[in-house]
Amino acid sequence: MSSRKQASQTRGQQSAEEDNFKKPTRSNMQRSKMRGAASGKKSAGSQPKNLDPALPGRWGGRSAENPPSGSVRKTRKNKQKTPGNGDGGSTSEVPQPPRKKRARADPTVESEEAFKSRMEVKVKIPEELKPWLVEDWDLVTRQKQLFQLPAKKNVDAILEEYANCKKSQGNVDNKEYAVNEVVGGIKEYFNVMLGTQLLYKFERPQYAEILLAHPDAPMSQIYGAPHLLRLFVRIGAMLAYTPLDEKSLALLLGYLHDFLKYLAKNSASLFTASDYKVASADYHRKAL
């Protein structure tokens, strides 16, 4: 009797573990995260108390949705052996359940529900900045003007001023650490995304000229506020593919929205149509 009870308990535990891997629900992700936090106290000691461990490292980290594949394989092997140890079921029935479960338990495949939820990541642009996005589009695409480069105040300078502003407000150390990480992440995303996602077609010849004139300079040292604002229209789609869990993503969005409020507060000095100039006839020919 005791051996049968143990076998039954083993099957129940293994089935529960296997279900956790198959269904990356929010509750399972949270439980996985809690287990990881308990086992990594040494590393957690160096992190700020109010930050999720996934936020440092420029908004990256290991996702709770992708457990090590070795854990899954071990669970499956035990599951196959269990029926033979208990009630003496026929051997022809043993291979059938694992075959069905192998197709569904692949830890590298994200569920449709989880994918759709990630596609819903949105960064809210303050109402004060939306008219400027429209004017920026009109100046470039309809009036055929170009933002003058290098910018009078580049992206690096804007981010540095924001970081200094937050630090001057007397924030505690862990808050200051978070601001540095967010500012660094914005800069990295800007430099990666500018050439492929943040330019209008009419601006591409100008971008090519900048690359020739400043081959070693990051674009955050060349471009300014209008292109930085465009980043926040696009960045939500990129964040949907980061390995941040729900808590870390919500924390990050809070910091991004705080930065956008800073841009809105200083919009009069950061956004002005006088920074644009009508493109020459020669440039028009290049842009065709």
Curated annotation (Swiss-Prot):
Region Disordered, residue ranges: 1-115
Gene Ontology CC terms, in alphabetical order: NuA4 histone acetyltransferase complex; nucleolus; nucleosome
Record field: compositional bias (Polar residues): 1-15
Gene Ontology biological process terms from the UniProt entry: chromatin organization; DNA repair; positive regulation of double-strand break repair via homologous recombination; positive regulation of striated muscle cell differentiation; positive regulation of transcription by RNA polymerase II; regulation of cell cycle
Phosphoserine PTM positions: 71
Annotated localization: Nucleus
Keyword DNA damage attributed: yes
Signal peptide feature range: none
InterPro entries named among the record's database cross-references: MRG (IPR008676), MRG_C_sf (IPR038217), MRG_dom (IPR026541)
Key words, A-Z: Chromatin regulator, DNA damage, DNA repair, Growth regulation, Nucleus, Phosphoprotein, Transcription, Transcription regulation
All copies of domain MRG, residue ranges: 117-288
Gene3D superfamilies referenced in this protein's UniProt entry, alphabetically: MRG domain
Assembly and oligomerization: Component of the NuA4 histone acetyltransferase complex which contains the catalytic subunit KAT5/TIP60 and the subunits EP400, TRRAP/PAF400, BRD8/SMAP, EPC1, DMAP1/DNMAP1, RUVBL1/TIP49, RUVBL2, ING3, actin, ACTL6A/BAF53A, MORF4L1/MRG15, MORF4L2/MRGX, MRGBP, YEATS4/GAS41 and VPS72/YL1. The NuA4 complex interacts with MYC and the adenovirus E1A protein. MORF4L1 may also participate in the formation of NuA4 related complexes which lack the KAT5/TIP60 catalytic subunit, but which include the SWI/SNF related protein SRCAP.
Function (record text): Component of the NuA4 histone acetyltransferase complex which is involved in transcriptional activation of select genes principally by acetylation of nucleosomal histone H4 and H2A. This modification may both alter nucleosome - DNA interactions and promote interaction of the modified histones with other proteins which positively regulate transcription. This complex may be required for the activation of transcriptional programs associated with oncogene and proto-oncogene mediated growth induction, tumor suppressor mediated growth arrest and replicative senescence, apoptosis, and DNA repair.
The protein's name: Mortality factor 4-like protein 2
Name of the gene this protein is made from: Morf4l2
